[in-house]
């Protein structure tokens, strides 16, 4: 008996991957093996960078807080130490938002940190 191959399922699987790689450059978009490898590698990059995004944003928030704190005559570390002593539990994301969009509120927070 000849070997039976489910061509419909194979073709559908390949089509699905090639659809996902639309927009890639060169052979990465239309050669099955290259496209499959590129797509799989893209998944690993996505997994890695979902974790890296968290540290990148934290670094950005710290830079923004530091810049705004120095305008008020304080360093970042002194500001964070003062906030801890004053018992103000406010995260870096909110502090960075205050520094960028609400400078008056940020000045009030810095004043409390200086007083502590």
UniProtKB/Swiss-Prot annotation:
Recorded GO CC terms: cytosolic large ribosomal subunit
Gene3D superfamilies xrefs: 6.10.160.10, Ribosomal protein L20 (1.10.1900.20)
CDD domains in UniProt: Ribosomal_L20
Gene Ontology biological process terms, A to Z: ribosomal large subunit assembly; translation
Keyword terms: Ribonucleoprotein, Ribosomal protein, RNA-binding, rRNA-binding
Pfam families in alphabetical order: Ribosomal_L20 (PF00453)
Alphabetized HAMAP family for the sequence: Ribosomal_bL20
PANTHER family linked to this entry: 39S RIBOSOMAL PROTEIN L20
Task of the protein: Binds directly to 23S ribosomal RNA and is necessary for the in vitro assembly process of the 50S ribosomal subunit. It is not involved in the protein synthesizing functions of that subunit.
UniProt similarity note: Belongs to the bacterial ribosomal protein bL20 family.
NCBIfam families: rplT_bact (TIGR01032)
Protein name listed in UniProt: Large ribosomal subunit protein bL20
Annotated source species: Bacteroides thetaiotaomicron (strain ATCC 29148 / DSM 2079 / JCM 5827 / CCUG 10774 / NCTC 10582 / VPI-5482 / E50)
